[in-house]
Structure formats: C-alpha cells, structure tokens
C-alpha cells in the first residue's frame, strides 16, 4: 500500500484510455492508467476482426490492436496498472483515487474512460445459466459449442460479428432480433443473411431459458403477436448493447438518465474542474473504436491545457508543490 502524488490518473483503458495515455505521456504528464484487473483493453479484447480501424488494410484482431496501443503508451512513459479504481474523490484541486490493491493516488487531473459493459437480457435464470450456455463473448466461448445449435440475440454489428464468428464452430446459428430489420451496417447484415449456417428469426425475443444444469432450449416470444415457441439450443450468445460503467462516479459527476457521463461538448470536460471523460462512457451514439480513440486524444489535450493553466496561475511554485502544499 502506498500514497502517490501524480499529475494525471486515467481510469479505464480501451481505445479511449490508451489513446489518452499516449497523448498525455508525450506531453510529459507521466499518466497512471488504471486499466482494470479484468477489463484491461476494454470490449475490443473480446472482438475478433476489426476491419474499420484506419491503417489496417487487412483488418486487425481486437486484442492485437489493444496490445499495440498499450505498448505505445508505455513507450512514451505511461504507467499502466492492471488494477481497478474502487473509490474516488473528485472534488477540489487534488483528486483522490483508491485502487483494489490498496494503492492511493492523488492527482491534479483525472480522465474517465471506463467504457461500457454488456447488457443483459434481464430474464429468469440468466445468472444461473451464465457459463452454462449463456455467454456474452463468442471469441471466449465459441469453441465449446462445436457442432451444436446456438442462438445469437441482437441486431447490431456486434451481433452480426458474433453470429459470423460462431459459424466456425456451431452446426447452426439462429439470430433472434426483436425488430423486422437489422440495425447493423449493410455489409455486416448482408453477410449474415447470405450465410448458409445462419437463420434469422425476426420480430422475436428470448422470453425464457430452459434447462436444469445447462441451457437446453429457449422460449421465443413474437413481439408482434405475443405467441411463444420453444427452440432447442445449447448456447445463447447475448449481443444487445451495453451500459456505461459509471457506477464509481454516479452522484459525483453529472450523468444522463442512462448513466452516461455528460461533458461540455465539444470538449471532454465534466461538471467538475480537472475531471474529463471519453469513449463509450460518454458516447452512446457512435460507439466505435476510432471515435473512442478520438475522444481519448481530446481528453488528454483538455487535461494538458487545464494543468498548464494551473501552472500559469501559480508560477512561484511547481505545479505539484502548489496543489500538495
């Protein structure tokens, strides 16, 4: 356990956190990145092929992209810790961040990049059957469903990606979507519709999970007629969106009704001086790796300008001496 005085703490990783770390480190701020004990790298750590990140003609694996970003940030002097922020005090000129391992950081500025978490179905037995047929990660669990029939729930690009990846293992993939058309990009949707191992069930939702020790079937409910039917499957992969990981700052910074952190657009400033936010913690519209990286860059520059303004206001002392005096 220790107490450390630093210029900048970045809570979270992913494209936003790592990009913020690159820019902050290059600016000489020596940022400390609390990347997460389990979630380091963010959602892209469970993403297979990333085809729309500029600079990769043939695409890039999500974990590979995140590892490159992490290494780049460390190269410029960022300290990246596989630890979680568990308690924060963001008021006043000095922010305090306590970690799960017992470390305490006192920083002049904080950037929030905790991202978002997989949204759950919210139905009976979902928790009980998690890991027993219910999953949110095709790349993690797809192998276990070789030559089995499975369901993918969702209609966005993530659901399309999951379904296509799972055709490598499953004998049949049924995509269940509550509407009559996909929200996914045309190219991803068409790949799913054209795939011989994928069937789409429109205007339907998973109303129930069936199975004592593991998933044996799902109950599908038609969202138009209300009729229900049983579909025998052994796996259910959920890809219905995300919820922001803002619990640790709820009540401290302003958020919207869904928990997304509010910023003073076009900047990344929150309602608290010296606290900035970026990535999917803020953005529920675009939610792309490249947009997260862009806001991470912006947050680092906003933090840099904020700290520079503090230094100009107190020229007699060094920045650290001034706030920690």
Model feature map: region roles:
Residues 80-146:
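Glycine/small-residue-rich loop that forms an oxyanion/phosphate-binding "nest" at active or ligand-binding sites
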Residues 6-76, 148-149, 160-186, 256, ...:
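Beta1-alpha1 glycine-rich phosphate/pyrophosphate-binding loop at the start
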Residues 12, 113-114, 120-122, 153, ...:
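Short, well-ordered coil/turn residues at beta-beta hairpins
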Residues 5-7, 83, 146-148, 203, ...:
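Phosphate-coordination loops involved in phosphoryl transfer and adenosine-cofactor binding
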Residues 70-99, 104-107, 167-265, 305-325:
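A Rossmann-like FAD-binding core segment of flavoenzymes
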Residues 14-15, 39, 116-118, 157-158, ...:
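Residue-level detector of alpha-helix initiation sites
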Residues 22, 160-162, 272, 278-325:
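A conserved FAD-binding loop/helix module that cradles the flavin
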Residues 5, 122, 127-144, 240-288, ...:
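FAD-site-proximal beta/loop scaffold in flavoenzymes
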């Amino acid at each position: 356990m220790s107490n450390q005085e630093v210029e900048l703490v970045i809570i979270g990783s992913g494209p936003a956190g790592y990009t913020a770390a690159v820019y902050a480190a290059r600016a000489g701020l020596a940022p400390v990145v609390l990347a997460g004990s389990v979630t380091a790298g963010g959602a892209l750590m469970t993403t297979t092929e990333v085809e729309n990140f500029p600079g990769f003609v043939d695409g890039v694996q999500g974990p590979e992209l995140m590892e490159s970003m992490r290494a780049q940030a460390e190269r410029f002097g960022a300290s990246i810790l596989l630890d979680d922020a568990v308690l924060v005090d963001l008021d006043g000129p000095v922010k305090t961040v306590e970690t799960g391992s017992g470390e305490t950081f006192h920083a002049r500025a904080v950037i929030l990049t905790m991202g978002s978490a997989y949204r759950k179905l919210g139905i009976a037995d979902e928790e009980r059957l998690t890991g027993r047929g219910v999953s949110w990660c095709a790349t993690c669990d797809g192998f276990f469903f070789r030559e089995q029939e499975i369901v993918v729930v969702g209609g966005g690009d993530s659901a399309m990606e999951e379904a296509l990846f799972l055709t490598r293992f499953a004998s049949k993939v049924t995509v269940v979507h509550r509407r009559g058309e996909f929200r996914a990009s045309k190219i991803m949707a068409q790949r799913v519709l054209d795939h011989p191992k994928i069937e789409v069930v429109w205007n339907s939702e998973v109303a129930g999970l069936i199975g004592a020790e593991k998933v044996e079937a799902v109950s599908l409910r038609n969202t138009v007629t209300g009729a229900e039917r049983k579909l025998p499957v052994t796996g259910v992969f959920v890809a219905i969106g995300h919820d922001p990981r803002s619990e640790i700052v709820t009540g401290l910074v302003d958020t919207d009704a869904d928990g997304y952190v509010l910023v003073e657009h076009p900047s990344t400033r929150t309602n608290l001086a010296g606290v900035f936010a970026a990535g999917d913690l803020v953005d529920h519209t675009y939610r792309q790796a490249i947009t997260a990286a862009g806001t991470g860059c912006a947050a680092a520059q906003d933090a840099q300008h904020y700290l520079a303004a503090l230094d100009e206001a107190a020229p007699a002392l060094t920045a650290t001496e001034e706030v920690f005096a």
